[in-house]
Amino acid sequence: MSKDRGVVKRAIVTPDKHVPLHDVLATSVVRQAIEIIQPDLYIDLGDLGEWGSVSHWQWKRKKKPPVEYIIPKVEKEIESVNLFLDEMDSSLNKAGCKKRHICAGNHDEWLDHFVSEYPYLDQYGFKKAIKADERGYIYHQAGDYLKIGKMFFYHG
């Protein structure tokens, strides 16, 4: 008897990594699981990055520095998150998983709020910063539900 009997779709769902604060060992285990399980789809439920450089909490009760001071920190975080995604994508590619979703979380939205404040820096918006389209991810805005079959996925 096949162990897959009755399985409609197999998915790996990962919430709240908060890169660069993520657990590297746990991430390694998830990557190994992806390669073994060979899921039909991958869902990132949001808060992919911590994005502390653009957090409204960062400057609470303090004067916000000029944007020229913030940009290098944002770029460093973007680089870190993209390296993380490169590793995840490598495992997803090995597993043959082509269907990939990413739901923006509240932390991810902070990048978009930053762009709202500095519209000429639109390359720092979350979707563009993580290269969602280039990577082949189906992007879902924060607050939107992702429905697959009878299941709903949401970053709450």
Regions found by a protein language model. Name each.
Residues V8, I102, Y137-Y139:
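Residue-level signal for the start and early helices of compact helical domains
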Residues R10-A11, L41, M151:
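Structural motif
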Residues M1-H22, S28-Q32:
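Acidic, histidine-bearing metal-coordination/catalytic regions of metal-dependent phosphoesterases
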Residues P20-D133:
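Core catalytic region of metal-dependent phosphoesterases/phosphodiesterases
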